[in-house]
Amino acid sequence: MKRSLNENSARSTAGCLPVPLFNQKKRNRQPLTSNPLKDDSGISTPSDNYDFPPLPTDWAWEAVNPELAPVMKTVDTGQIPHSVSRPLRSQDSVFNSIQSNTGRSQGGWSYRDGNKNTSLKTWNKNDFKPQCKRTNLVANDGKNSCPVSSGAQQQKQLRIPEPPNLSRNKETELLRQTHSSKISGCTMRGLDKNSALQTLKPNFQQNQYKKQMLDDIPEDNTLKETSLYQLQFKEKASSLRIISAVIESMKYWREHAQKTVLLFEVLAVLDSAVTPGPYYSKTFLMRDGKNTLPCVFYEIDRELPRLIRGRVHRCVGNYDQKKNIFQCVSVRPASVSEQKTFQAFVKIADVEMQYYINVMNET
């Protein structure tokens, strides 16, 4: 009875360990803020003989909640046997361990259940029973004291990582979700495609009909005709061409190429005065040696520039064979360089026009 009273009185004093007086040994005094010396031979360490936890969690609970201390004392005093002698520790180390244990007990341990992925359980102080194991002294005798689980073992149990099955289950759930979303997207796309196909059916039928009509035409003949035509006559450029010609050659090309539109360039001397006509027209006469050519210019978008009689002018336009009139779109005085190069241009144009007329007559 005396011993239990001493223990109860010691526990109520600021949460410190009960230290029997007959086990104390001489040691160096140190301030409370420092740790005990590791090399001191007078202090016995718990790692030599025992594998105890730093402190049971009920003492840390008493330090934090002193009101619940007497109730917990009556329950816990019967569980701890009196035969177990605890190793000696300094008061400062005990106080530090109490603070660490209070931090751990208040931290709210949480772990995942092995069977359920989403359920979380908070660790309670009363869910476990204290256990203690004597390693060196009692192991050979076969005498085991009351089982008390150490704080280190609790921490190891709590720090067990999640089994790989949990991660695999998560991956399978994600795959199922993505697969279901893909299936729903495919069904919606299938509906859209069906509606689009219904709307595109008549167009598709029309395209098939056109293909059938085109297939009925013999391909060999068309390919041969086009290839021969391309070989016989190849255009050097797709730009507008102006045929340089004298008055006599212009009339000749116009007579032999009546179905084509030809734009001629004529250099000749103004041989008459410019006279106004109906519909804002101006008429004049051009002479090239012995050949004369009546010309007309319509002042629709611009006025006719001033022309000087007896000078060489450059006239560009189309020759109307029925009316025997040259419809000009551009009239201006010719430069010296144009007069020098005009004969060479006429020869080149004659060669091209002769080749063109021959090809058109053969086809």
From Swiss-Prot:
Q: State if ATP-binding is listed as a keyword.
A: no
Chief location category: nucleus
Leader sequence segment: none
**Family matches, as InterPro entries:** Spata22
Feature: compositional bias, Polar residues: 1-12, 30-48, 98-108, 140-157
Q: Where is this region: Disordered?
A: 1-51, 98-127, 140-170
Explain the purpose of this protein.
Answer: Meiosis-specific protein required for homologous recombination in meiosis I.
Can you name this protein? Answer: Spermatogenesis-associated protein 22
**Gene transcribed to yield this protein:** SPATA22
